[in-house]
UniProtKB/Swiss-Prot annotation:
This is Membrane protein insertase YidC. The gene is yidC. Interacts with the Sec translocase complex via SecD. Specifically interacts with transmembrane segments of nascent integral membrane proteins during membrane integration. It comes from Shigella flexneri. Its main location: membrane. It is found in: Cell inner membrane. It holds the Pfam family 60KD_IMP. Keywords: Cell inner membrane, Cell membrane, Chaperone, Membrane, Protein transport, Transmembrane, Transmembrane helix, Transport. The keyword Ubl conjugation does not apply. NCBIfam families: PRK01318.1-1, PRK01318.1-3, PRK01318.1-4, yidC_nterm, yidC_oxa1_cterm. It comes from the Bacteria. The keyword Cell inner membrane applies.
Amino acid sequence: MDSQRNLLVIALLFVSFMIWQAWEQDKNPQPQAQQTTQTTTTAAGSAADQGVPASGQGKLISVKTDVLDLTINTRGGDVEQALLPAYPKELNSTQPFQLLETSPQFIYQAQSGLTGRDGPDNPANGPRPLYNVEKDAYVLAEGQNELQVPMTYTDAAGNTFTKTFVLKRGDYAVNVNYNVQNAGEKPLEISSFGQLKQSITLPPHLDTGSSNFALHTFRGAAYSTPDEKYEKYKFDTIADNENLNISSKGGWVAMLQQYFATAWIPHNDGTNNFYTANLGNGIVAIGYKSQPVLVQPGQTGAMNSTLWVGPEIQDKMAAVAPHLDLTVDYGWLWFISQPLFKLLKWIHSFVGNWGFSIIIITFIVRGIMYPLTKAQYTSMAKMRMLQPKIQAMRERLGDDKQRISQEMMALYKAEKVNPLGGCFPLLIQMPIFLALYYMLMGSVELRQAPFALWIHDLSAQDPYYILPILMGVTMFFIQKMSPTTVTDPMQQKIMTFMPVIFTVFFLWFPSGLVLYYIVSNLVTIIQQQLIYRGLEKRGLHSREKKKS
């Protein structure tokens, strides 16, 4: 086993990963066709069963803090639009990123209200409540840390329902508090609900990369319970009416996309019904409904929940609800990606640049792996030293493959050489490489993070393809500096074109990942020379015997 064969192993592993990724449906679920009829099969006992209608006509009010710009419909009190001023829509754009949207092309809303027998959002009791508000615009003032938006509704029986949105400075968690005053003579049976609904198919202005060669993160629904910390639920599964219907004490429901999330976190001592529903017209929903509570005559009842609407900032999300930070989807290598991100974030706290942080973490990773790298090159050198004996063995035994295999194994054992010793370090490096990819694609902190010169977004591909070309050049130098025993002309041609093939692959990769690979290759060149000097002293390597 030599260096060039190891490069072939990397290529095969890389291609296998690409095939596997394309096969893994939940990373990029296919959009469902728009439905023209209302689907009636929904989760039993859910708010959707109650038939919570669209918000209908109401007044739109504006609610602004330093990090949120919300539009709330007074008909039902749903959040119909959410802008994030701290996150530009695109690089160098003055327009904020829009997370929630209500338009003819796309629906993504955070609905909530009070259902149950006497709830104002129960269709049996009439249209959804039309709340009264004191003003049309609420703004968090300078020096103010909290903004409250009270909305009141009084039904025909004189019962008063108050829905208050509470927003805090610098916070993407919005508390939604309900206050029910029973003015009648009979108990009121009330349940609260929170629901996220979204169009399955993205419109062109939001579909920024479904046809690109690059891989994509999960877009869909998710939920958490004490028994299941984090479970994803694909939109197409909901569209097929394979709906969620479970009871949970605690937990949350959410909708996810790259870098951003919305989630409802109910706050009550009882159990909640978590459900999904196909609402028809190409729209799906995930939500919760609480157990009914009784508000006695002349008494006041309270219910509370929290809406997360914003970027997937792990430490802040973890403080809002247990396991909410798991919505940062690092894929099946999360156990590597999470520690890598924590280390990267710690380094960034000192250097202040994510690109330099990636360079430093590359040195750290390669430093930790140096003993394995040294063992790899030593094993390869020993294998090269055995080539004359192996060649003589092949000439002596001819076409007797079984005898050749047996004697080769005996030779390896006698010489204390592991024929797979050169592959093992590469197998260790591949998960780290892929984990770093998921970290770059899933961490909002790296979204639009600049490095230097022409690299203004480490999570996006190099616009001028300079980094992929540099990566190919470094791979070419590694290849030329590595001894080889390959004599087959076809294998030699494959190895010659390997840097070119990798360069083409890396054209669409995040520039931060390509930067990691360039630095890793440069470290490999340095380590290679240091190891070769040591092997020369042991008689296991000779520069004069190197073949191109």
